[in-house]
């Protein structure tokens, strides 16, 4: 950071302090990860200087011959990773990727079936405060009250009743395998298109550890960070028949110049995901999540749906020990464990309070945490949350966090 330090000491200090926070804390936010130095280097490259409206070989600016190379490589690698017919790597975020699909598949006011946010869905799947809920008529499906898993019979019933033009599958806080084949069958039955938002599970899909939605969906959207371990950004995968509509909706429809430095970083991350050790990493992510869930159950915590099939563990802290999600998040943060409060199915608390917390294993697994480390993480979580007013116990938890993070340093 020598250049930043010379130019802007205040920003340099903030960046350095953020690095120290990441290095000294255990990161359990399920949507976060640590990218490689190669990904960061690509994102901080001279490509940030280049305007490149359009697509490879069809630009509105001169001098795009090299960004054409990096963007084409990103597209080809994404196709190889997921077996997609067409890929657009230009969306700046997952939300913009979702917006583009809606603009292609729907007219304003059309009916869409999407997962309830408090049951594990996402803001862009029809939340009233989001553009999706304002522009379209979203009908919500959720999970079964007893199993806390998606009730496909209920999804089918709602689809038959409301005849949606589009069905959205995918979630931001759902810890079980999603049956895309069933969603496709339901969509076909009511003559709806199927969109899958695989933002949270894209890395698992790439590694073959979760069913691939590309086989079933008309459109698949994703972020490129989270389990995919790339830069913050979005991507759309679709059938060849939708290529022109998707591309013109991204540009010039909702975006101008693409972020070619970010696209180059996406290409680097996709290249990493094509390597054999990426599958090993994803296998460890899932192993660690299962160990974390089981260890917390042994400590007396109720896990939503009773466990996990992926990278994510949803914990009912209110029902387990009487703390709200907000209180649990703040307590864990005080000892060096970063997570987020999260609504759980049929939550009675407000969204900014919640009854649950969402935990994820991708970031800590990138640091090298294994099953034994996550057993210790569960014990530290239990110690802190069960003694949230006991400064001595909280100090013990903090010291145990420091010992773990020292054992698995970041970017060393």
From Swiss-Prot:
EC number(s) on file: 2.1.2.1
Example GO biological process: tetrahydrofolate interconversion
Catalyzed reaction equations: (6R)-5,10-methylene-5,6,7,8-tetrahydrofolate + glycine + H2O = (6S)-5,6,7,8-tetrahydrofolate + L-serine
Keywords recorded for this protein, A-Z: Amino-acid biosynthesis, Cytoplasm, One-carbon metabolism, Pyridoxal phosphate, Transferase
Pathway(s): One-carbon metabolism; tetrahydrofolate interconversion; Amino-acid biosynthesis; glycine biosynthesis; glycine from L-serine: step 1/1
Principal subcellular localisation of the protein: cytoplasm
UniProt GO cellular component terms: cytosol
Function: Catalyzes the reversible interconversion of serine and glycine with tetrahydrofolate (THF) serving as the one-carbon carrier. This reaction serves as the major source of one-carbon groups required for the biosynthesis of purines, thymidylate, methionine, and other important biomolecules. Also exhibits THF-independent aldolase activity toward beta-hydroxyamino acids, producing glycine and aldehydes, via a retro-aldol mechanism.
Name of the protein in question: Serine hydroxymethyltransferase
Species this protein is from: Staphylococcus aureus (strain COL)
